[in-house]
Swiss-Prot record:
Pfam family, one: Forkhead
Gene: HCM1
Organism phylogeny: Eukaryota, Fungi, Dikarya, Ascomycota, Saccharomycotina
Species in which this protein is naturally found: Saccharomyces cerevisiae (strain ATCC 204508 / S288c) (Baker's yeast)
Main location as per UniProt: cytoplasm
Stated name of the protein: Forkhead transcription factor HCM1
PROSITE patterns named in the record: FORK_HEAD_1, FORK_HEAD_2, FORK_HEAD_3
Length: 564
């Protein structure tokens, strides 16, 4: 009985064990299902490093990527654009320069750093030092990628020179415009990888670096790129060199081609569509062209001849343009005096009535009568020789007054010349009150036009009257003065508010017979006339007059008085 009960109990226990195992398995499955429902695939559950490393490295497709933050592919540097800053040896750099020359890549961007370019420029020089401008020039010529007008790479060159301790600033240049820069000895390893052969070896190796560059072809390609023109439009080598020395000037007229002056010491050539006009070679043709049109007053073609016209009177020109041009050709004025005023010959015509466009400026150059031919060759401001005997002679006075007078005695207010009549000798001649007496008596304001109008200085000590007339006091107060003669022979001043100027010494010296005969305000001529009249009348008081004037009895003494 007991064995049966034990077997029943064991069977029941095994059943319970199996049942519990099934229940536990179901419970685990239920928990896993609930866990999957609660935790989505992209939840914030911390993941291990292994799971993170197992993620694929390829980017997401456009369908699954976010439009807000698109993925950017990482930029990869190519081997050709990589700059060598101490990564290449000296031989590798020279080989790369040779490949660039063979492949025709000299105008492309070089794969070298700015510090390497500076080092190459300095060490290739014979003295091993260059100024900043020389470094610019060497880099621009050997690597045309860097334009001369571009300031960005030039700023980088300056920064490298200032911040890199491999470059040393030494003495000042000869012109005083900059300092020399050198490479510090022992700093070659910064530019050339594994270089331990010394400074002098590197410098000697770079002395023949010019063979890796085609300088002539590089300059031609550079000019084509900068100007955008072909080889046919490029200037010759000599013109290119001269253009660098002298500034280029372009003159553009409305109806004429461009005139380019590349040299200041050469006569410019006039470039036209068909030919080039050179004033030296085509002088005869230019003379013929201008002589054909010289009589045409409406043509304004070079050389521009200055003509004088009376704008107010309408008189003809005082200068013959044809004669003026022929005289200029004989003196070679076109090729020498006007070498910088040579302009292209055009067919531009002025208006038909171009005279009315003349301004008042032209009136300053017109003369109402041609100049006299008896002008002296000496200085215009020198005084004339003093001749007291002939100066006051009646014939000479008459001759002197004729060329200066513009009006007849009938139309003027002047009295007729003194005659030999006795009544006329008793009167003191009056000074001429003409318009000339009311001009400013300054002798330095205007230049005399002929020899007859030269200023005659007063025959007095220290030129007192001249100092009085030219005194700055009268010019400052601007007080007009009129000089009036009195019977006593003295000069009086009269303020005239209606007159705007002072008497003219220049005119009074020539028009008046007694302008220069006054001796300290005394009219010697009138005194002498009155004395001779009294002698001829046979007055009883002759002896008393001779006591006061003893020199009147001897004619030879008269000249002496006048000399005094």
């Amino acid at each position: 009985m007991m064995n049966e009960d034990i077997s029943i109990i064991d069977g029941h226990n095994s059943f319970l064990t199996e049942k519990s195992t099934v229940l536990l398995t179901q419970a685990k499955r239920t928990l896993e299902d609930e866990k999957e429902m609660i935790t989505p695939p992209s939840s914030t559950v911390r993941k291990t490093m292994k799971e993170v490393n197992k993620r694929p490295s390829h980017p997401l497709s456009p369908d699954h990527s976010s439009p807000i933050a698109p993925s950017k592919a990482k930029r990869q540097r190519s081997d050709t654009c990589a700059r060598s800053n101490g990564n290449l040896t000296l031989e590798e750099i020279l080989q790369s320069l040779e490949r660039r020359r063979i492949n025709g890549e000299l105008a492309k961007k070089p794969p070298y750093s700015y510090a390497t370019l500076i080092c190459l420029a300095i060490l290739q020089s014979q003295e091993g030092k260059l100024t900043l401008s020389q470094i610019y020039h060497w880099i621009h010529v050997h690597f045309p990628y860097y334009k001369q007008k571009d300031a960005s790479w030039q700023n980088s060159i300056r920064h490298n020179l200032s911040l890199n301790d491999a470059f040393i600033k030494t003495e000042k240049s000869c012109d005083g415009k900059g300092h020399f820069w050198e490479v510090r000895p022992g700093a070659e390893t910064k530019f050339f990888k594994g270089e331990n052969r010394g400074y002098e070896f590197v410098k000697d190796s770079l002395q023949d670096i010019g063979k890796y560059f085609e300088i002539d072809s590089t300059l031609d390609e550079l000019e084509q790129v900068e100007s955008g023109e072909g080889n046919d439009d490029l200037p010759d080598e000599e013109e290119r060199e001269e253009a660098g020395k002298f500034p280029s000037i372009e003159i553009q007229l409305n109806s004429s081609p461009i005139l380019r002056v590349s040299q200041l010491h050469h006569i410019p050539q006039l470039k036209t569509d068909n030919s080039v006009l050179n004033p030296h070679e085509n002088l005869e043709s230019m003379r013929n062209m201008i002589e054909n049109d010289v009589n045409n007053i409406d043509s304004l073609e070079p050389p521009y001849v200055m003509k004088k016209y009376h704008t107010s009177l309408g008189l003809p020109s005082l200068v013959n343009a044809k004669d003026h041009f022929q005289a200029g050709v004989k003196n070679n004025n076109i090729t020498q005096a006007n070498r910088f005023n040579t302009l292209p010959i055009t067919s531009a015509k002025s208006p038909q009535n171009f005279r009315k466009y003349f301004t008042s400026f032209n009136s300053n150059f017109e003369d109402l009568s041609p100049l006299r031919s008896n002008v002296g060759a000496g200085s215009l401001l020198d005084p004339l020789p003093y001749s007291p005997l002939k100066l006051y002679d009646q014939k000479n006075l008459a001759l002197m007054s004729k060329p200066q007078s513009q009006q007849s005695y009938s139309n003027s207010q002047l009295p007729p010349p003194p005659s030999s009549h006795g009544s006329d000798l008793l009167k003191t001649p009056k000074m001429r009150h003409s318009d000339g007496l009311e001009k400013t008596p300054s002798r330095l304001i205007s230049t005399p036009k002929d020899g007859n109008s030269i200023l005659r200085k007063w025959q007095t000590p220290s030129h007192l009257f001249e100092d009085l007339y030219c005194s700055p006091l009268f010019r400052a107060i601007e007080t007009p003065i009129r000089y009036i003669t009195t019977p006593g022979g003295t000069l009086e001043t009269q303020i005239s508010p209606r007159k705007s100027s002072a008497p003219d010494v220049l005119t009074s010296a020539t028009n008046s017979k007694f302008a220069s005969s006054g001796l300290f305000g005394v009219d010697v001529y009138s005194v002498w006339k009155r004395a001779t009249e009294k002698i001829s009348d046979g007055n009883n008081t002759t002896d008393s007059n001779q006591k006061h004037h003893p020199y009147h009895n001897h004619p030879s003494n008269d000249s002496g008085n006048e000399k005094n």
